From Swiss-Prot:
<dbReference type="GO" id="GO:0005840">
    <property type="term" value="C:ribosome"/>
</dbReference>
<dbReference type="InterPro" id="IPR041988">
    <property type="entry name" value="Ribosomal_uL24_KOW"/>
</dbReference>
<comment type="similarity">
    <text>Belongs to the universal ribosomal protein uL24 family.</text>
</comment>
<protein>
    <recommendedName>
        <fullName>Large ribosomal subunit protein uL24</fullName>
    </recommendedName>
</protein>
<dbReference type="InterPro" id="IPR005825">
    <property type="entry name" value="Ribosomal_uL24_CS"/>
</dbReference>
<dbReference type="InterPro" id="IPR008991">
    <property type="entry name" value="Translation_prot_SH3-like_sf"/>
</dbReference>
<comment type="function">
    <text>One of two assembly initiator proteins, it binds directly to the 5'-end of the 23S rRNA, where it nucleates assembly of the 50S subunit.</text>
</comment>
<keyword id="KW-0687">Ribonucleoprotein</keyword>
<keyword id="KW-0694">RNA-binding</keyword>
<dbReference type="InterPro" id="IPR003256">
    <property type="entry name" value="Ribosomal_uL24"/>
</dbReference>
<dbReference type="Pfam" id="PF00467">
    <property type="entry name" value="KOW"/>
</dbReference>
<dbReference type="InterPro" id="IPR005824">
    <property type="entry name" value="KOW"/>
</dbReference>
<dbReference type="GO" id="GO:0019843">
    <property type="term" value="F:rRNA binding"/>
</dbReference>
<comment type="subunit">
    <text>Part of the 50S ribosomal subunit.</text>
</comment>
<dbReference type="GO" id="GO:1990904">
    <property type="term" value="C:ribonucleoprotein complex"/>
</dbReference>
<dbReference type="Pfam" id="PF17136">
    <property type="entry name" value="ribosomal_L24"/>
</dbReference>
<keyword id="KW-0689">Ribosomal protein</keyword>
Length: 118
């Protein structure tokens, strides 16, 4: 008789105010202080992939005869709480607030600089 396996518990989602293409700064971990553009967001896992940050090496087997294997470096994901939006003009990281315009649209605004992102 087979045993029942439990499903992994769903991660509680946090509000991610980070989007693809944003410039962020890492505020915790081994890459603290580095900045880069967000390549991809994983909202169900509360994680982001940042260009040039948290690099991992992976060994690939050869795909064809006569071809040698290789070592590939690629970005691994970071938890969204470990990055903060970064103002490239003022060179400072800042928290984000959501501002509702008079026409009802929502915009993201950096609290320190007042810079509107959307």
């Amino acid at each position: 008789m087979a045993t029942a396996t439990s499903k992994p518990k769903a991660v509680e989602r946090i509000k991610m105010r980070i989007r693809k293409g944003d410039t962020v700064q890492v505020i915790a971990g081994k890459d603290k202080g580095k900045t880069g553009a967000v390549l991809r967001t994983l909202p169900n896992e509360n994680r982001v992939i940042v260009e040039g940050v948290n690099m991992r090496t992976r060994h690939e087997k050869p795909s064809q005869e006569g071809e040698s294997g290789r070592i590939v470096t690629e970005e691994a994901s970071l938890h969204a709480s470990n990055v903060m939006l970064y103002s490239t003009d003022k060179k400072v990281a800042s928290r984000v607030e959501i501002v509702v315009e008079k026409d009802g649209t929502k915009k993201r605004k950096l609290k320190k600089t007042g810079e509107v992102l959307d």
